[in-house]
Amino acid sequence: MRMCDRGIQMLITTVGAFAAFSLMTIAVGTDYWLYSRGVCRTKSTSDNETSRKNEEVMTHSGLWRTCCLEGAFRGVCKKIDHFPEDADYEQDTAEYLLRAVRASSVFPILSVTLLFFGGLCVAASEFHRSRHSVILSAGIFFVSAGLSNIIGIIVYISANAGDPGQRDSKKSYSYGWSFYFGAFSFIIAEIVGVVAVHIYIEKHQQLRARSHSELLKKSTFARLPPYRYRFRRRSSSRSTEPRSRDLSPISKGFHTIPSTDISMFTLSRDPSKLTMGTLLNSDRDHAFLQFHNSTPKEFKESLHNNPANRRTTPV
């Protein structure tokens, strides 16, 4: 189950990396970030005279160009002038910096670059030995690319909302599919980054638990010697120790008691307290001893009287 989950996570990471990079590249390279009504201005020289034609038409713009969709200049695109001559920037320095950042488009370009390196790390993780360290690098690249992307989107929205040169000419505007491609790229990049970091953390925990268990096993086996070695060690220690053959303190105590001292522990009987039972017991003991003493004598006499047991000497 874990292998299946890990395979799904790697699939999500690979597909997401490709999708995020493709969407952001298309968004940066196309001119459909914003639809608005504006004036298409063009210059034409005829007979050393410059004629200006101003016409309010529907336009679509990207990060660097604006193209006309209607009127006499339909299909004509021109470079966006973020610093027109009639604009006064000395009164508002923040707006000037915003226009400079908007003109450079540094954050969208940085996002594309980070997504590219993140995709390379994901591809390298399939072949590199330390794949999990490469996956961690990919996660960092994707998270950074997403942050750069969202900063660029915020700067773009702020620049369009606070553009004094087009505030009067623009009556309505809406964001195009290039803008939404960039937004989707941000979401996918963050998801891929989180999944990549999760893969690294999970694998790192598994490796740490495995190494900890192996270390415990090694330490346990190192402390306990083999059975044969322990058995030999015990037998050798028993044979070499001089005290092992000595008697225990309890047995020493029993064996050291002399036979002469036994009388000290015997209890004397009072002859006045002798009963009939004690007299019968004494008679039985006397009869038993008499029979025991007489039996060997009778047995010896039978052996001597038996002619089969007599020794015969040859004549």
Curated annotation (Swiss-Prot):
InterPro entries registered for this protein in UniProt: CACNG_subunit, PMP22/EMP/MP20/Claudin, VDCC_gsu
An individual GO BP term: protein targeting
Entry membrane topology: Multi-pass membrane protein
Functional note: Regulates the trafficking to the somatodendritic compartment and gating properties of AMPA-selective glutamate receptors (AMPARs). Promotes their targeting to the cell membrane and synapses and modulates their gating properties by slowing their rates of activation, deactivation and desensitization. Does not show subunit-specific AMPA receptor regulation and regulates all AMPAR subunits. Thought to stabilize the calcium channel in an inactivated (closed) state.
GO cellular component: AMPA glutamate receptor complex; dendrite; excitatory synapse; glutamatergic synapse; postsynaptic density membrane; Schaffer collateral - CA1 synapse; somatodendritic compartment
UniProt keyword list: Calcium, Calcium channel, Calcium transport, Ion channel, Ion transport, Membrane, Phosphoprotein, Transmembrane, Transmembrane helix, Transport, Voltage-gated channel
Family membership noted in the UniProt record: Belongs to the PMP-22/EMP/MP20 family. CACNG subfamily.
UniProt-annotated stretches for the region Disordered: 232-253
Name under which the protein is recorded: Voltage-dependent calcium channel gamma-3 subunit
Subcellular location: Membrane
UniProt GO molecular function: channel regulator activity; ionotropic glutamate receptor binding; PDZ domain binding; voltage-gated calcium channel activity
Primary location recorded for the protein, binned into one broad class: membrane
UniProt source species: Rattus norvegicus (Rat)
Keyword Membrane appears in the UniProt entry: yes
